[in-house]
Swiss-Prot record:
Alphabetical keyword list: Acetylation, Allergen, Lipid droplet, Membrane, Transmembrane, Transmembrane helix
Name of the protein: Oleosin L
Biased composition (Polar residues): 133-145
Residue spans of biased composition, Basic and acidic residues class: 123-132
Tissues and organs where the protein is expressed, per its UniProt entry: Expressed in seeds (at protein level).
Lineage top rank: taxon: Eukaryota
Modified residues (N-acetylalanine): A2
One cellular-component annotation, GO: extracellular region
Amino acid sequence: MAEHYGQQQQTRAPHLQLQPRAQRVVKAATAVTAGGSLLVLSGLTLAGTVIALTIATPLLVIFSPVLVPAVITIFLLGAGFLASGGFGVAALSVLSWIYRYLTGKHPPGADQLESAKTKLASKAREMKDRAEQFSQQPVAGSQTS
């Protein structure tokens, strides 16, 4: 039973065993940066909504009939809170996915990420080889001494 569990753990997170610690730290820092920026965006949206409503509501009440600004205010309030909550949920979802990826729990889409990373690395190697090959070719019309 213990052997089966150990084999299962090894097959579940092979990308973590091959990665150096520095690369995992960089991934974690990137995850925190991405999630943190989404959380900050969520907070700024909430603050902007509250400030806009604070400024706009009295003006709408003074210069419009009573029902129109009430409907507009309720719409703006709802839209602002929904956007703020949506950004917060998105940030938490991203942080959760990245945490599961870094701990080797294989979240949905991890295979696609690994495949894209492999393709990108192979294309980068191919472009490097082409650049080296191109730099070694003699330029037409140049004189050789």
